[in-house]
Every structure is written in C-alpha cells, then in structure tokens.
C-alpha cells in the first residue's frame, strides 16, 4: 500500500487524509461558518486527484490500481457486500414468498370447479386458466415500467417500493377474501379475483423494478484494485464480481422465498384456498415493518426530475444528425439553438446512454426465453396433473425449480465461477445468456418427449376427460424439466438483471431494469398467442415448437451480440469514470460517510494529532 498525506478543503466541507488514510471533518465557528485549514484549495484538490489516480481508497487504505498485465493475469475476487444490501434482499425474499405462495395455486384455482377431482374455484378450464394466467404475467411485467418512471423521475426508489408494498398488501387481502368457501360456493369469486390480480400486479411491479437497483446501489462504487492476501498472492478485487455475487445472492433469496409453494399448496389441498392465501398475507407484514424502520440506513439516488427530458433532447438532436449519438456530445456540438449542451449533459452521459441502448438491444430476444420459462407456471403444472401424483399436489412440483436454484447458485458462485476466473477463462454476460437459452431449449425438448410418453400410456392416452384425468406414468420423472429451467435461469435471468443494472446510467437504473423485466410481458403475449395449442393432443407439438424457436433465438442472440463480450471491461469502466468526475464535495462526502460513527473517539484523537502536525508545518 502507498502512503499519502493530503489536505482537502472547501468552503462548505474540509477533510484531511493523513498518512494512515483517516480523515478529519471541517471545523465550524459558533455562527456555523466553516474554518478553512489551508490557503491553497486548488493544490489540495490536485494532490487528491493525483493520489487517487495511482490507487484506490478503500475504508481509509490506499490500494494500488491494477496494471494492464495484472488485469490480464491476476484472478478477480469479490469485494465486501454491505449489510444494508442484505436487508433489502430480505425484503425481496418476503415479497417473493408472498408472490409465489399466491400464484402457484392460481392454476388449480382458475382451471377447476369446487366439486372437481382436483378442487378449484372458477372452473375456467385449462385454456381459460392459461389465458388469465398469461394476462396476469403480462400485467406484472408491464407495471414495472410505469413504476420505474415514477421512481427515477419523481419519488425515488425507496419511496416507490414503500407505496407499492402497501398496494400489494391490499391486493392480497382482497384475494384472500375471494377464496372464502362461502364466496366460492356462491359463485362470486371471479370479480374480486380479477380486481386482486390487477392490484397485486401494480404492487409487485413497483417493487420488482426498484428493489434490485436499490440493493445494488448499496455496493461500494470503487474501481478494481490489487490486494495482497495473507499468503502473499495478489488478487484483483473487482466490483463487477461483487455486483455479480450480489445478484446471485439476490436471486437465491428469490428462490428461497418461492419455497412458500410447499406450504401454500399443502394448505390448498388440506385446508382450502383461503388458508393458502392467508399465509402470504401474514408474511408480507415483515417487509412492511422493515421498510418502515430502515430508510435512514440506505444510500439513495435522488429522483432525477428532467432525466427523460434530457434523453428526449439527445434523441431529437441525434435524429438531426442521422441518428449519430457521437454528434450529440458537447465536445462535438456546443450549442443547439440557444441551449449550451455542456449545461445539459456531458460526453460521459452520451457514452452511458449508448451503453444502455446496447443492453436494451440484447433484451429483444428475451421474450422467447420467457415463453420457455412460463411453461413452468401453467402447462407443466397441467402436465403433472396428467400423471400419477399419489398424494402430492400437481402444482407442488414447480418447487423443484427453486430447490435446484438454491443448490446450484452457490455452487456456481463459489466453485464454478471462481475456478474459471482463477484460470482466466472468460465467461462473460453474452456467453452466459446464450447458454441460458440452450438450457431452456433442453427443458422444452424434455417436456415434449415426456408429453409423448404420457400420450402413449393408458388409461386415458390422449383423451382426457372429467372422469379420466391421469395416465399410468409417475410424475417424478418430470423433475429434470424443472432442473433444466433452473440452470437456464442462472445463466440467462440472473445475468440479464445484472446486465441491465450495470449498463444503465445512474439516474436510469430502475427504468432499464424495468425494460428488461418488460420482456416478460412480451413473453406472456406470445404465450397467449399459442395458448390455443395448449390442449390435448397438441401439447407435444407445442413443446417441440417452443424448443425449436428457443434454440434458433439463442443462436441468433450469440451471432448478433457476441462482440459485446470483447467490450465488457471497457464498458464497465464508464461507471468509474462517472465516479472520477464527481465534484470534490462529492468525493469528500464519500470519505466522510465511510467513517463509522462508532469510531468517533478515534476520529477525535486523529483530528487533534493532525491539527498539531498542521501547526508545526506552518
């Protein structure tokens, strides 16, 4: 580690970074004005920039920046994930507990009547239930876009999450009321059920588009640096790896929460739907309490207000220059009419916007992927109902997707990915997403083969009726389809979320994340379009068609975007350029905020020592 001795001063904030990299806050007079500790403010700022250019300041210690050779040869490791991020992850876990606990029983609730062999409520049939299920999925992934706009421009992420959580709770309460047996028997559940779907969709959309960006915002915003381990070996602490691990943990928590299906499906079959929906309602109280008491602990990106106006101005100016975004940079075009561009945005903002647009292009193929993923929530549940389930509910088997993810996410994060990084084997986002498409294809191929086997068995063969609902084939051989989908999520879904966040400008992270989630809505539309084929005996061909389409989409995705992997490191550096472009006040605030209030006594001691050194030097 290098040693430094710096003074940083400004009229409204002064800090001293001493040889051990601790800092001192500004002195204030009785009238509240600041005391200036040096006469040469500009010199101090220059010295700060010089020291930061040769190293990275982390918790008061200065670590060297990696050289080109070190970037190419040293293994990359994860940095520290702050506890604040884990609190937000707990909120997401509870929200997903509620969401999956509610939605997995939906298929039976919608498809069957209360007197059927598999009890339900609305008696819509498989095709009708699939249509309403796909509408709900579509709605849940449309609402994040509106919520993201509200968060980025008006309320901020945290406030949007709080409002959405309250709306969500109201929706679950209405849903629970529709499942009361007397309401079902009276045939009055349909209206309340549809209303609850709309309200729950609003709530989950507001949380979905903002909770992962809020979590990722709590991670340290520092460039890569070289750290020497206790055994003398060197590693690069890479924020990209830190972000990747945070999203792995985030997605892992989603699937821990989704195990609520084990409880709600059991309650559905033994106690009834009202108890299955009452459990998520009670659990959802936990995130409401957490959100109510934890606001002061988080880092908050304030709403940007005019960010979308600026983006519109950029696109308007680009359209006047043959859609060349380079021509919208202030360094290329100084004014438009009476507007000075440097007062509206800088060159770096244009580079960030170009990076975000590249990310959005990759989202275009995701609807095909979500069609594969969506089979797990409707048609695969119905497929399980055509098999021998014993005393196990057919909608319970979706839990094997979550179980597989809970097992294999830590294996990938702690064994496979570090091993690849250790030997400098590139496994960058586009390659991971392509692999996700291939696993989704494999899952649909397996489902198609299994459906053909079901049709070959009696007593129903392909002629299922109200009195003949299942063939003589064990449901347990359906598990590999869920496991293959789980692998596809590790590579396609997690990477997509991470890609959306890391490639978005700071003031647009919610909206870019929402646009990624919005691809789910298009997947739901495609699923609605093919829902007419989700009937016997066409299901084998439906799964086959989905598999072929997903395979072609995966190949085209790789062909179109594989060159993005070569640009990955360069694109990630834009985030740190933005940090380097912070004003001195922002830099000082970062240092000040990093100093724990618990160390106040040590701080006062260092302050007195530094003041004594200053007096000696003057």
From Swiss-Prot:
Polar residues bias spans: 34-50
The protein's name: Probable peptide transporter ptr2
Residue ranges of the TM segments: 131-151, 161-181, 187-207, 247-267, 273-293, 400-420, 430-450, 475-495, 510-530, 541-561
Residues recorded as bearing Phosphothreonine in the entry: 35, 45, 54, 618
Membrane topology type: Multi-pass membrane protein
UniProt similarity note: Belongs to the major facilitator superfamily. Proton-dependent oligopeptide transporter (POT/PTR) (TC 2.A.17) family.
Compartments where located: Membrane
Leader sequence residues: none
GO molecular function: dipeptide transmembrane transporter activity; tripeptide transmembrane transporter activity
Species name: Schizosaccharomyces pombe (strain 972 / ATCC 24843)
Residues with the Phosphotyrosine modification: 23
One Gene Ontology term from the biological process aspect of the record: negative regulation of TORC1 signaling
Matching PANTHER family: OLIGOPEPTIDE TRANSPORTER-RELATED
Key words of the record: Membrane, Peptide transport, Phosphoprotein, Protein transport, Transmembrane, Transmembrane helix, Transport
Function: Uptake of small peptides.
Region (Disordered): 26-50
One Gene Ontology CC term in the entry: plasma membrane
Pfam families documented for this protein: PTR2
């Amino acid at each position: 580690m290098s040693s430094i001795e710096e003074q940083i001063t400004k009229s409204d904030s002064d800090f001293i970074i001493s040889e051990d990299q601790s800092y001192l806050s500004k002195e204030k007079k009785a009238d509240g004005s600041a005391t200036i500790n040096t006469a040469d403010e500009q010199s101090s700022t220059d010295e700060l920039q010089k020291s930061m250019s040769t190293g990275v300041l982390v918790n008061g210690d200065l670590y060297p920046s990696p050289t080109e050779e070190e970037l190419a040869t040293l293994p990359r490791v994860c940095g520290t994930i702050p506890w604040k991020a884990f609190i937000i992850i707990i909120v997401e876990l509870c929200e997903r507990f509620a969401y999956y606990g509610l939605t997995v029983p939906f298929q039976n609730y919608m498809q069957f009547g209360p007197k059927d062999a598999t009890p339900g409520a609305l008696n819509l049939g498989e095709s009708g239930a699939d249509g309403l299920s796909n509408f709900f999925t579509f709605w849940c992934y449309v609402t994040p876009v509106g919520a993201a706009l509200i968060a980025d421009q008006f309320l901020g992420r945290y406030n949007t999450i709080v409002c959405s959580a309250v709306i969500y709770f109201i929706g679950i309460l209405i849903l629970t009321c529709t499942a009361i047996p007397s309401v079902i028997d009276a045939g009055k559940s349909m209206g309340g059920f549809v209303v609850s779907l709309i309200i729950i969709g609003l709530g989950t959309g507001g949380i979905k588009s903002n909770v992962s960006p809020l979590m990722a915002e709590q991670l340290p915003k520092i460039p890569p640096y070289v750290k020497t381990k206790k055994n003398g070996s060197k590693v690069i602490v890479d924020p990209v790896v830190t972000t990747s691990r945070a999203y792995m943990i985030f997605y892992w928590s989603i699937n821990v929460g989704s195990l609520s299906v084990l409880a709600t499906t059991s309650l559905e079959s033994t106690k009834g739907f009202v108890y299955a929906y009452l459990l998520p309602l009670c659990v959802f109280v936990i995130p409401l309490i957490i959100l109510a008491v934890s606001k002061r602990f988080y880092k908050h990106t304030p709403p940007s207000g005019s960010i979308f106006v600026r983006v519109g101005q950029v696109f308007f100016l680009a359209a006047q220059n043959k859609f060349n975004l380079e021509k919208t940079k202030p360094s290329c075009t100084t004014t438009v009419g009476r507007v000075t561009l440097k007062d509206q945005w800088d060159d770096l903002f244009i580079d960030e916007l170009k990076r975000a647009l590249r990310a959005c292009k990759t989202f275009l193929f995701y609807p095909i992927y979500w069609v594969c993923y969506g089979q797990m929530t409707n048609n695969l549940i119905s497929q399980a109902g055509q098999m021998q389930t014993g005393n196990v509910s057919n909608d319970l088997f979706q839990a094997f997707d979550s179980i597989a993810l809970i097992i294999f996410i830590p294996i990938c994060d702690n064994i496979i990915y570090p091993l690849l990084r250790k030997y400098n084997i590139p496994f960058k986002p586009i390659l991971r997403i392509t692999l996700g498409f291939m696993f989704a294809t494999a899952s649909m191929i397996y489902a198609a083969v299994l459906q053909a086997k079901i049709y070959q068995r009696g007593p129903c063969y392909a002629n299922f009726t109200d009195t003949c609902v299942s063939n003589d084939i064990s449901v347990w051989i359906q598990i590999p389809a869920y496991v293959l989908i789980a692998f596809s999520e590790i590579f396609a879904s997690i990477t997509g979320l991470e890609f959306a966040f890391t490639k978005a400008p700071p003031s647009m992270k919610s909206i870019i994340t929402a646009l990624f989630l919005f691809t789910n809505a298009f997947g739901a539309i495609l699923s609605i379009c093919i829902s007419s084929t989700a009937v016997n005996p066409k299901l084998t061909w439906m799964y086959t068609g989905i598999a072929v389409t997903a395979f072609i989409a995966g190949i085209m995705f790789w062909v179109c975007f594989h060159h993005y992997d070569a640009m990955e490191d360069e694109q990630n550096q834009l985030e740190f350029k933005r940090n380097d472009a912070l004003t001195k006040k922002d830099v000082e605030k970062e240092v000040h905020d990093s100093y724990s209030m618990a160390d106040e006594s040590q701080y006062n001691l260092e302050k007195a020592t530094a003041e004594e050194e200053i007096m000696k030097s003057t």
